[in-house]
Amino acid sequence: MGKRLQSQNRGKGTPRYTSPTHKRKGAVKYRKFDESERKDKIIGTIIDILHDPGRSSPIARVRYDNGEERLILIPEGMKIKDTIECGISAEIKPGNVLPLGEVPEGIPVYNIETIPGDGGKLVRSGGCYAHVITHDVSKTIIKLPSGHMKTLNPMCRATIGVVAGGGRKEKPITKAGKKYHAMKAKAVLWPRVRGVAMNAVDHPFGGGNTQHAGKPTTISRHTSPGRKVGHIAARRTGKR
């Protein structure tokens, strides 16, 4: 009898496949959407800039005028002791948080809410940004980094600017150990071994004198877990 596949082991759940979230600095999201932001603005000061393992961008600790502290995603060009404004009357400049309905068309934004007050869900990776395309009476249309157009409530908040950390991929990873530790921070199993390179006991495509699958690579959605590898329930394969 063969061994369990990686997908079967992952489903069981072990420390090898568990993301080390205990090393994270904390939740990174907007403060509560209260009356101070709905009617005016609140000012905060960046008191520290932190590295968060498993996150592709630096984060900042912000202290607001009311004494509240939060972790936020910062844009390119921000530094310690800089101030940010949060609210409907905030100025249009990098780092400030406003409802989408108050952001002019063509301005880059990030950390966008999908529901007013949810803290920010979209466009949070280092170097990413979306564009405000157009406004309507009860909706705002934004263009995501993928090119997809999304319609949102104009009271959903977003931050002006581009997420910091965009140049992280410009420096090449020249050693396998560097890549190993980078993947370890996100619980990604690396390196990824091809099925045809494994022994027959480890994978349905393994074994043999030459590296070939030896059986159909397109498999049913309802097949047994130990055979579910390759193109699962594929409508078509190959070039389009």
Swiss-Prot record:
Domain of life: Archaea
InterPro entries, alphabetized: NA-bd_OB-fold, Rib_uL2_dom2, Ribosomal_uL2, Ribosomal_uL2_arc_euk, Ribosomal_uL2_C, Ribosomal_uL2_CS, Ribosomal_uL2_dom3, Ribosomal_uL2_RNA-bd_dom
Biased composition range(s): Polar residues: 1-20
GO molecular function, one term: structural constituent of ribosome
UniProt KW Ribosomal protein keyword: yes
GO biological process, one term: cytoplasmic translation
Positions with biased composition (Basic residues): 21-30, 224-240
Transmembrane segments: none
Keywords carried by this UniProt record: Ribonucleoprotein, Ribosomal protein, RNA-binding, rRNA-binding
Coiled-coil portions: none
Region ranges (Disordered): 1-33, 204-240
GO cellular component terms attached to this protein's record: cytosolic large ribosomal subunit
SUPFAM superfamilies per the UniProt record, alphabetical: Nucleic acid-binding proteins, Translation proteins SH3-like domain
Subunit structure, interactors included: Part of the 50S ribosomal subunit. Forms a bridge to the 30S subunit in the 70S ribosome.
Protein family membership: Belongs to the universal ribosomal protein uL2 family.
HAMAP family: Ribosomal_uL2_A (MF_01320_A)
Main function: One of the primary rRNA binding proteins. Required for association of the 30S and 50S subunits to form the 70S ribosome, for tRNA binding and peptide bond formation. It has been suggested to have peptidyltransferase activity; this is somewhat controversial. Makes several contacts with the 16S rRNA in the 70S ribosome.
The name this protein goes by in its record: Large ribosomal subunit protein uL2
Organism: Methanococcus aeolicus (strain ATCC BAA-1280 / DSM 17508 / OCM 812 / Nankai-3)
